[in-house]
Amino acid sequence: MTEPTQLWGGRFKSGPSEALANLSRAPRSYFRLYKEDIAGSRAHASELKRAGVLDESEFSAIRAALEGIEADVGAGREEPIAADEDLHTFLERLLMARLGTLGGKLRAGRSRNDQTANNTRLYLRRMARELSQGVIAIEEALTEQASRHTETVMPGFTHLQPAQPVVLGHHLMAHAQSLLRDLQRFADWDRRFDRSPLGAAALAGSGIARRPDLSAIDLGYSAACENSIDAVAARDHVAEFLFICSLVAVDLSRLAEEICLWSSKQFSWVRLHDSYSTGSSIMPQKKNPDVAELTRGMSGTLIGNIAGFLATMKAMPLAYNRDLAEDKRSLFETIDVLELVLPAFAGMVGTLEFDVEKLREEAPKGFTLATEVADWLVGRDVPFAEAHEITGAVVRFCEERGHDLAGLTAEDLPGIDPRLHPEMLAALVLEKALASRNGYGATAPEKVREQIARFETALAECCAFAGGPIGGGAFAGAKDGAEEARRR
């Protein structure tokens, strides 16, 4: 095994204390960025060749060694040792073992500051696509369920109180719409941070690697960062990514809360599949909504990660500070949580079985059709303020007699208000109430079907992002992009 590599030390008389070394050592989880670090090294090697630091044979040797290192690390044949301070020292140790002093040439003109900034951006651009795929699986499950239930009526709620009847598919698509915006945020994020920090070096820019625009294209970015200080000091790409992930978690948590309620015996609106439920160690009858509960609980962790990271950033002067290393602790936990949650949640949603008859039975309860009374009166030129009062009197009449609107008779109406006629009772039908809500985006069954069709078109755009490459380089197609940049 080769000796550990240290990237600094010439101006020090002694090495770091054991306590400092332990504090400085990167957690093992940080080494997951090895592919991004090696991609950056390949691009930087091209820069050094352009600058005349590497000749053709040296460049080829370094590129070949980097490919071998990537394969060996990926296969588990090479692993960090305790003395490796971080990912950069680990990979340089492996490079030096293969190439000797030639491996040390790769360090010219770059800093760990721009390396780590680049690693994080590349990694997050990849994860934006991978996490999007997980969210899309949930979207597809929601859309399939909604398509099955464009005629299924249920009570809609405000303030957790029965409000108006709605179509179950409409309710499910409301959740799908919020997750769609999260997917669009991932794509927007990617466009905003499609800039390479490589070439910024420590903070002032490199005196050797002077074509960061070319290395940017090698890595799949559209361009290099506009300001070298900002390139190494900025972590708003991390904060925004954490925010998007926390929004995904919150959106899932809201649906999870409903599933917990709806699957309870008090509601019995939905049945959970056995493969996405657990039992009790003492109560044999229990069937618990663990996926929903764990999702709801883990959302708090993700909210805490974005709040904690912003607190770390708030008092940090330019440019790079070691505090910035904390970005990975928050990022990796957030990403790891979502990677566990998303497939489980998609499976749970896709296997839900709704009790259509129970939902229909509950739909008119709690005077959910009261708005139909007010609308019927407005249709007969009664001002809405008065219609509202009359409808309230109708509800009070029913409550005092212990029945819902379905218990009203033609004989009851004149005694409540002379403007109420027997034909009003015909408006108190669930299907009519749904059909009357037929504006754009409303709950009428045909409008829900139209909404689903539009949604599928929008989701296809998100699928194109999730399944697409990172720019034109990074891990493929870099040569053609760089040649085009040289011609420009």
Swiss-Prot record:
Keyword Acetylation: no
GO BP annotations listed: arginine biosynthetic process via ornithine; L-arginine biosynthetic process
Name of a matching Pfam family: ASL_C2
GO molecular function: argininosuccinate lyase activity
Record localization: Cytoplasm
Sequence similarity: Belongs to the lyase 1 family. Argininosuccinate lyase subfamily.
UniProt protein name: Argininosuccinate lyase 2
Organism annotation: Rhizobium meliloti (strain 1021) (Ensifer meliloti)
